[in-house]
């Protein structure tokens, strides 16, 4: 995160420097630097963002828009001595009207947005750096305290050792709690949202300024005008990086907070139960396989062949065994273990009733 913010600071500072150059061009910086900072040079005039200058070191007052033909700036041409016979009113290279020259104010607007973006990015970097430095100091102090307590505990007796160990545990828990609380990072999403808005506004204003330069000064646009492509590219990169950083923070928060235990098996809490509607596991550790309430294992109570004319009281597919049968998960050979020992009395009574029914049937026949 800090590396990403440092890269953002670097990109924004480069944009800020390049956007500053057209603003301080002629007439603000004129003869002192040889009129080298200009957007265009056409005829006897050199054009900047806030005004123009002539080749004989006469510059207009810094303001938005170039002076029209009736402006007092051109009064030097009315000299009776005829010192400026070749001068006429300033004419833009693209033959555009002077009203369009007021579009150059978007250079200043874009510079203001970029300045705010740079200050906010720098402030966020400093805040995160201070937060990280504050969390490291208590952690180091806690480690040093633990080391000192361990050294002192070795020199004490066994009773003092137990007391010191309990104290160290309490101190370590409290120190870890404070460190964990301090290590909780702040929510920087509002800062990123504001930075994203500023980067978009700065990108759009810089793009509009470049288009206005092309509209006014093509085909005599100087290197300073073409250099404005760099802030456009860098600001688009900054906007994309801010979107990626914001997305990564929201995804990390989603995984760590809302679905912390569902998405991380190593962080499953003991008190949190996982419910599954397809759960087929047994609660006591083994599986139970039964055929209803009865088992057809060792079925010896079916009627004999000699009594085939009698009604079938006990079909062959039903067992007279009335106990619950448990099949172990490790035993798949068909060996059944009866766990109905507590119901022997009821089982015997049931067998007696069956025998009486058989005897009555034989007596009738």
UniProtKB/Swiss-Prot annotation:
Cytoplasmic compartment spans: 1-3, 129-197, 246-365
Residue numbers on the Extracellular membrane side: 25-107, 219-224
Region: Disordered, residue numbers: 154-181, 327-346
Membrane topology: Multi-pass membrane protein
Classification via InterPro entries: pH-response_reg_palI/RIM9, SUR7/Rim9-like_fungi
Assigned GO CC terms: cell division site; growing cell tip; plasma membrane
Entry annotated with the keyword Transmembrane: yes
Domain of life (superkingdom): Eukaryota
Main location: membrane
Membrane-spanning ranges: 4-24, 108-128, 198-218, 225-245
Keywords: Cell membrane, Membrane, Transmembrane, Transmembrane helix
Compartments it resides in: Cell membrane
Biased composition (Low complexity): 154-166
Family statement drawn from the similarity comment of this UniProt entry: Belongs to the palI/RIM9 family.
UniProt function note: Required for the proteolytic cleavage of the transcription factor RIM101 in response to alkaline ambient pH.
Protein name: pH-response regulator protein palI/RIM9
